[in-house]
């Protein structure tokens, strides 16, 4: 075999020997949007910014990711475990604890298998970004100079 025929045989053999999807295996097997693992030497706050950017790419919000990050900085210092002094507000975007069960139900999907806790950074962020995408930042209207 010469030339193009030989090249075709090599390409076909290579594709049959490499399992489908092996080169593009995800870093995580968690379902749903923005299932990002922390990378080496990444702080929690850096990871939260990545999750916010990821969610905003999927559900655009007024002011984009920069505004969302600004609001999260003011609300919690980008700390997923932040709880207000009286315990009324929780997580990255400081959702009202009393409103959290309804917000979780309304703004997540069961197939995503998100953690139900408001103190989960990914879940808290996805709920906030979806709310802001649909309704604007009204729930966070009084937040700083963002």
PLM ranges: what are they?
Residues 1-27:
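Secretory targeting and sorting signals
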Residues 16-17, 24-78:
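Export/targeting segments at the very N-terminus of extracytoplasmic proteins
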Residues 27-30, 39, 133-146:
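Catalytic cores of secreted/periplasmic lytic hydrolases that degrade extracellular macromolecules
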Residues 47-51, 64-68, 121-131, 136:
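Stable alpha-helical elements in mature extracytoplasmic
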Residues 56-60, 73-77, 97-101, 129-137:
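Sec-exported extracytoplasmic/periplasmic mature domains
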Residues 58-69, 80-85, 137-146:
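Surface-exposed patches in mature extracellular/periplasmic domains of secreted proteins
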Residues 86-109:
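Substrate-binding/active-site groove segments that recognize
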Residues 110-123:
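A short, structured beta-strand-centered segment in the mid-to-C-terminal lobe
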